[in-house]
């Protein structure tokens, strides 16, 4: 309402008289979005759906979503200052690489080489184990040393192919450029599938599956350049140093999926990437740059779609059901490199940071090296630890996996290795909820964490589901703002596991009863 907005404006550090009418209107829209009044917001969402502003117009509006948190400090939002100005450095080749056959969501890949085989750079060494799967390629040339379970960043032991590096980097005969323009869609998708390209943002969903399921359903492609996780700056540096790869991949995706609206969404704290991005997209009217408010989890798929298009992904559905397909910065880059060089997924840029790291950096070994390098090698390249780390993470501090060993390899979904000193790992024994409601305000999915936690502890699974337990994206916003320091996400993961186990048991019981009924019916028919 205008009266509420006037009161809100008085609290702002700028004077209303200094703002133009157009700026006033834009600020009002942002105010409505942050305060989430359903009736007021409908008009803003309708405007987003019905209009496709050009690049110059869209730059004036900052897009966001309701809820979320602001990790970091005023001087250092997101704790990114340690590495956001550090150029990508290439790491020396390791003596051996460890390549898990499961670096993606879906069925593990199946090894197609044997111990003692000589392999070349980019050679397929494991084939996809199903439709939702991805092949694995040799990231160095050399000899297969072992095929055995090795430690994975997820904490388990996974069948892995260990290759001893011969230092020659002989490219495999299958590595050659492809003519994207002359290929059919089926050939393009097969080319992406055979390259082992998966989501590089952490989810590692096979890219060819996302593309194939989205063709005909999606009218918008979004490149997720939010990189909202604290400390991580690998995507930021890629956009600064190799923006042509990401934009080239975005154009290919737009052609492949037949969409006329292709968005690259970047948080405001990466504004130094805007000039080059605008220059690269200026000649293609399908492409748009959308600045995003610096907020976590702005990069979560559902929140990003809502911020950019005003659409909401229905509960239990996929982004394609909202007409959108979302890809990571380096996923788009991997697609571009596949067609222009023929190289499959064999490298990864990783941010190394945290209070215990001597020299925080953004690291990438020369082509073919990072996938399979050990965590220990990566930290040593950053000068080791300036003090003993109390917490090691693969990924960001909000959604990453805690590590108990430095021997886990870099995999396709690894975007950071973080090491923190003891004073940053604060725990409370037997925390008690004070019912302040901060977790509800922070939840980007509009859930009720306060009740989800209670039902989870009581193992009241039906009520937990009714509160939206299975819609939780485990972003950690609720746990971050909790003054009692309750490990909410840990409880939610445990409860979701119980719900899934219950559903599987119910399905198995129903199938057994169905088979029993069919057998009884068949027996009666025989008796007749």
PLM features: residue spans?
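Acidic low-complexity segments
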Residues: 146, 151-205, 215, 271
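Ferredoxin-type iron-sulfur electron-transfer modules in oxidoreductases and energy-metabolism complexes
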Residues: 414-430, 440, 444-523
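Conserved hydrophobic positions within beta-strands
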Residues: 142-144
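N-terminal, Lys/Arg-enriched amphipathic/low-complexity engagement segments
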Residues: 58-112
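Ferredoxin-like iron-sulfur electron-transfer modules
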Residues: 2, 16, 21, 32, ...
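Hydrophobic alpha-helical positions that pack around
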Residues: 260-373, 381-386, 396
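Short hydrophobic beta/alpha edge segments that flank linear recognition/processing sites
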Residues: 119-133, 148, 159-165
């Amino acid at each position: 309402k205008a009266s509420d907005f006037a009161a809100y404006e008085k609290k702002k550090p700028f004077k209303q008289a200094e703002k133009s009418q157009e700026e006033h209107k834009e600020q009002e829209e942002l105010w409505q979005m942050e305060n989430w009044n359903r009736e007021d917001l409908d008009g803003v969402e309708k405007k987003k759906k019905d209009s496709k502003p050009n690049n110059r117009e869209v730059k004036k509006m900052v897009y966001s979503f309701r809820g979320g948190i602001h990790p970091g400090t005023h001087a250092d939002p997101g704790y990114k200052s340690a590495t956001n100005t550090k150029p990508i450095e290439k790491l020396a080749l390791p003596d051996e690489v460890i390549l898990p056959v499961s670096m993606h969501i879906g069925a593990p890949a199946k090894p197609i080489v044997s111990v003692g085989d000589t392999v070349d750079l980019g050679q397929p060494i494991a084939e996809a184990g199903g439709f939702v799967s991805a092949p694995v390629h040799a990231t160095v040339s050399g000899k297969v040393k072992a095929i055995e379970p090795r430690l994975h960043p997820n904490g388990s032991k996974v069948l892995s192919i260990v290759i001893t590096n011969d230092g020659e980097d002989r490219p495999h005969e299958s590595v050659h450029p492809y003519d994207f323009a002359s290929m059919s869609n089926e050939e393009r998708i097969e080319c992406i599938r055979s390259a082992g390209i998966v989501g590089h943002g952490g989810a590692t969903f096979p890219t060819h599956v996302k593309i194939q399921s989205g063709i005909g359903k999606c009218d918008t492609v979004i490149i997720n350049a939010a990189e909202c996780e604290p400390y991580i700056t690998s995507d930021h540096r890629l956009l600064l140093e190799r923006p042509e790869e990401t934009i080239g991949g975005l154009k290919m995706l737009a052609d492949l999926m037949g969409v006329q609206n292709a968005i690259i969404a970047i948080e405001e704290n990466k504004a130094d990437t805007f000039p080059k991005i605008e220059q690269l997209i200026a000649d293609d009217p399908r492409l748009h740059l959308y600045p995003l408010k610096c907020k976590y989890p702005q990069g979560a798929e559902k929140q990003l779609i809502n911020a950019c298009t005003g659409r909401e992904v229905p509960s239990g559905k996929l982004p394609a059901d909202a007409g959108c397909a979302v890809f990571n910065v380096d996923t788009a880059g991997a697609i571009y490199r596949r067609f222009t060089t023929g190289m499959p997924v064999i490298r990864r840029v990783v941010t190394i940071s945290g209070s215990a790291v001597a020299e925080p950096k953004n690291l990438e070994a020369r082509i073919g090296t990072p996938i399979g390098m050990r965590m220990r090698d990566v930290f040593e390249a950053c000068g080791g630890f300036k003090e003993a780390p109390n917490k090691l993470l693969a990924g960001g501090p909000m959604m990453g996996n805690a590590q108990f060993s430095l021997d886990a390899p870099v995999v396709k979904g690894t975007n950071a290795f973080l090491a923190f000193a003891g004073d940053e790992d604060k725990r409370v024994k037997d925390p008690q909820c004070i019912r302040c409601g901060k977790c509800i305000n922070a939840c980007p999915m509009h859930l009720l964490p306060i009740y989800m936690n209670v039902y989870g502890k009581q193992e009241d699974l039906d009520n937990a589901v009714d509160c939206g337990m299975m819609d939780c994206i485990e972003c950690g916003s609720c746990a971050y703002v909790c003054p009692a320091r309750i490990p909410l996400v840990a409880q939610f993961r445990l409860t979701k596991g119980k719900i899934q186990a219950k559903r599987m048991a119910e399905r198995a019981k129903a199938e057994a009863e169905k088979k029993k009924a069919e057998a009884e019916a068949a027996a009666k028919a025989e008796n007749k």
